[in-house]
Amino acid sequence: MRFGEIVLSLLGGILLVGFGGGGLKDLPAASGKQADAVTGREIYSNTCIRCHGIDGKGVMGLQLVPKPADLTSPGIQGRLDASLFKRIHDGKPNTAMGAWSASLSDDEIWDVLAYVRTFRQE
């Protein structure tokens, strides 16, 4: 390895550690229990369905600007669990997607995420 490549590698590592890998390292872990898609479905039906619809495609909230995310899309399904957890927990600024951290426990958010993962298109 050349000296320049070593320096760049070290700088990249320092930046990654210094910025916390995009802020995802501080996410709460599930409490040790397996996330439950069945429980997640019940929570989804009471909280998320209004905008994201029964099938997760977002058709219930088409009147919203911007439209709700299509939870079946490869763009959503391809995201890391930690990223989706953070979105549910913290919401998305300037959209109708509010933070659910005041209403749902971390375990409940993980359960919802387990259910959302059932929307994956084959």
What is each PLM-predicted segment?
Residues M1-L10:
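Bacterial N-terminal signal peptides that target proteins for export
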Residues S9-G18:
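Bacterial N-terminal signal peptides
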Residues G12, G22, N46, D90, ...:
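Residues within well-ordered alpha-helical secondary structure of globular protein domains
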Residues G20-I43, M60:
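Electrostatic cytochrome c docking/interface patches
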Residues I43, F119-E122:
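Short sequence/structural segments immediately N-terminal
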Residues I49, G53-P68, T72:
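N-terminal, post-signal-peptide region of Sec/Tat-exported proteins
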